[in-house]
Amino acid sequence: MGLELFLDLVSQPSRAVYIFAKKNGIPLELRTVDLVKGQHKSKEFLQINSLGKLPTLKDGDFILTESSAILIYLSCKYQTPDHWYPSDLQARARVHEYLGWHADCIRGTFGIPLWVQVLGPLIGVQVPKEKVERNRTAMDQALQWLEDKFLGDRPFLAGQQVTLADLMALEELMQPVALGYELFEGRPRLAAWRGRVEAFLGAELCQEAHSIILSILEQAAKKTLPTPSPEAYQAMLLRIARIP
């Protein structure tokens, strides 16, 4: 069997890997694991990834669980164009520099609006207003750092061409954008960066990858989202409790 990718396009890192694979013609068997239903906490999936996280890549007996590691693995295995993960040592270090910062400052911050507006209400939990306000402040600060430190006067986050850094960043920022946050308003450099990345990826691929998250507010309003499993319910309560 070929490579299998376990994912849910509601998940930002799942979308990053999906887009990368599609853009580069990498053959993958897609296995959808419904996060809202809690399928990532099922016994069957935990046998594949005991962390219960998405995305997860299975290449024969080899299982890989972190999106940045998966992207690097696929880039090297399929020898994708050099701009994604440069062979030049310093250019590659810039990609890693961003990915390290991304894990600390972006990854846990920009996903919170989904918990506030969709996932919390789905299980009858309201995130306190002061936590929502702190999250907005944290997002604004992270956007400023993203713009000043990583983008600067360059066209892309790690240099003159699109890299894995841009893909990871775009997908994370799309999460609150899909929920109505005007992240790029008043930030012309970031808005132009987004336009360049999306133009490179192509409108059709972006629409394909983003269609589920872009419709999630409508699904929540119409009450058409699935009911989380008991295992997922407990995990969701714990995740909401960890919102700073």
Swiss-Prot record:
GO terms for cellular component: cytoplasm; cytosol; extracellular exosome; nucleus. Residues 88-224 form the GST C-terminal domain. Residues 2-82 form the GST N-terminal domain. It is found in: Cytoplasm, Cytosol; Nucleus. Its EC number is 2.5.1.18. One of its GO terms (molecular function) is glutathione transferase activity. The keyword Transferase applies. It catalyses: RX + glutathione = an S-substituted glutathione + a halide anion + H(+). It is an enzyme of class 2 (transferase). InterPro entries: Glutathione-S-Trfase_C-like, Glutathione-S-Trfase_C_sf, Glutathione_S-Trfase, Glutathione_S-Trfase_N, GST_C, GST_C_Theta, GST_N_Theta, GST_Theta. Pfam families: GST_C (PF00043), GST_N (PF02798). The keyword Cytoplasm applies. Glutathione binds at residues 40-41, 53-54, 66-67, 104-107. Gene3D superfamilies: 1.20.1050.10, Glutaredoxin. GO terms for biological process: glutathione metabolic process. Keywords: Cytoplasm, Nucleus, Transferase. Expressed at low levels in liver. In lung, expressed at low levels in ciliated bronchiolar cells, alveolar macrophages and alveolar type II cells. Conjugation of reduced glutathione to a wide number of exogenous and endogenous hydrophobic electrophiles. Has a sulfatase activity. Homodimer. Belongs to the GST superfamily. Theta family. This is Glutathione S-transferase theta-2. The lineage of its organism: Eukaryota, Metazoa, Chordata, Craniata, Vertebrata. The gene is GSTT2.
